[in-house]
Structures are given as C-alpha cells and as structure tokens.
C-alpha cells in the first residue's frame, strides 16, 4: 500500500497548536507503520460524497481525514471534529478526465456559493462586469486542468470573483485562469491518460509518497515548499529526459533555468 500525504494536510497541520501537532504526528506515524492498528479508531464517513474518506480519532476532538483504498492511504486534512467532517463533506478525490492528474476537488455547491455571494454583494448601481471565460469551450477549460465539477461556474467568473475561485482550484487550473485573465496564453496541461494519476506532474505538486518514517518526519516538520523540491511540469520534462551528451537550457529571465 502506498502511503501519501497532501499539501492540504500539511497546511491544516500547521494551523494547530504545538501540542495538537505532536498528537497528530504520532497518529500519522502509527498509520504509516500499521494502517490496521486497532488503536487508531478509523471511522468511515458515510455522509461524505467520496466513499473512500475515513476519519482517524486523535484525542477527544481532533480528527484526521484520510482517503483509503486497497492500494493507497492518503493523509488529506486534520482539524477539530466538526470542521474536519465539514471539510470532507465538501470534497472528493478525482482523476481529471482530460489530463489524468489526481485532484482533490471542492464540490459544486461550494463553488456556486462563491459566485452567488459575489453577485449579491453588488449594488443596483454597479454595472455588471463581463464573464471572463464565457466564450471558452469545456474542452479548452478541461485542457487547463479545470475540474468537470467547476466548468459551468468558471464560465460565470468575472474579475471580482476570479481570485476567490482561483484559491479553490487545483494549482494548474488556477494558474491557467489567472494567466488568461491577464491576456496570456497558457499551454494545455500534459495529458497522461491511463497512467497512475498520482504520478502525473501536476499531481506531484500536491501529493507525495512517503517511503519511510524518516521521510514522513521531515515532511511534517517543515512547510511543504521547504522539504519538497518542486519542479514545474515544464521544468520536470527537461530534468527527467534522457540525453546522449551535454544539453543546454535556454530561456528568458525568470523562466526557471537556474533551478533546472
């Protein structure tokens, strides 16, 4: 079984107190060593839209949300009981239908709330601002990694609601929409149909396999961007390519040549 953590888990862990973090880390180590440990009190979340979400009891009130299948155990989120359950009820783990990348996706009800709330904030004297992506086809939006669940709402987004939506989208989709909104032309995401959704370059930005306790300890003791060397998918293709001899990477300033 592959043991993974997500950036949403490390972000939520960082918001807890020091003592709470220690308790959560202990449970995470126990899960990695023995996911069937009887003392972990795993509970299936029957009301979650994703049938593979489970909670792990950490003390009297903290709950660790995990995504559990026969092949994988993914640490997704941690918080106090009600907040943890609410987080799980609003999300599901999906494989993007066009890019093949694994994504933790917020449900449509949440997305609609953002667009509607921005609309009601406007006064009767405020001109209606144009939707930024109304003319874009579903196929094009999907090629940027926008989840299917979000297509209709993304087409309603104007400049006032763009940042709210972008904060809740997977990174590759968020970056593409922000670039489009500023006049850019982002490249479509790399499609890996039929492959391991967690091995996709975009999925590697948010999910990582923990091979041993030492690696997990490093991951939990530092912010996500500190312990993980992140390569943008455009950089990764140069790093992982096989060359017959010396190779030169060229590009304008700020394109990531030094990191490669």
Explain the meaning of each model-derived region.
Residues 1-29, 40-43, 66:
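Hydrophobic, helix-prone linear segments
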Residues 58-158, 162-165:
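Enriched for short, Lys/Arg-rich terminal
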Residues 205-228:
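Conserved adenine-nucleotide phosphate-binding loops and their immediately adjacent elements
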Residues 243-260:
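Walker A/P-loop
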């Amino acid at each position: 079984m592959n043991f993974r953590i997500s950036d949403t888990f490390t972000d939520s862990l960082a918001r807890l107190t020091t003592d709470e973090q220690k308790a959560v880390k202990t449970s995470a180590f126990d899960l990695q060593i023995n996911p069937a440990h009887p003392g972990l009190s795993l509970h299936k979340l029957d009301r979650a839209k994703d049938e593979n979400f489970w909670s792990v009891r950490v003390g009297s009130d903290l709950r660790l949300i995990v995504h559990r299948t026969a092949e994988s155990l993914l640490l997704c989120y941690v918080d106090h009981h009600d907040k943890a359950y609410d987080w799980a009820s609003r999300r599901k783990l999906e494989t993007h239908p066009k890019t093949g990348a694994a994504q933790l996706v917020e449900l449509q009800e949440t997305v609609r709330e953002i667009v509607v709330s921005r609309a009601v904030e406007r006064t009767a004297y405020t001109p209606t601002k144009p939707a930024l992506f109304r003319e874009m086809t579903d196929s094009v939006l999907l090629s940027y990694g926008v989840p299917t669940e979000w297509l209709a709402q993304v087409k309603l987004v104007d400049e006032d609601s763009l940042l709210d939506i972008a904060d809740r989208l997977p990174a590759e989709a968020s970056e593409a929409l922000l670039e489009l909104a500023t006049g850019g032309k982002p490249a479509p995401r790399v499609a890996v149909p039929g492959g391991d959704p967690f091995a996709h370059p975009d999925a590697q930005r948010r999910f990582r396999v923990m091979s041993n306790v030492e690696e997990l300890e490093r991951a939990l003791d530092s912010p996500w961007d500190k312990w993980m060397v992140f390569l943008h998918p455009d950089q990764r293709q140069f790093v992982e390519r096989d060359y017959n001899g010396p190779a030169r990477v060229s590009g304008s300033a700020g394109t990531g040549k030094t990191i490669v």
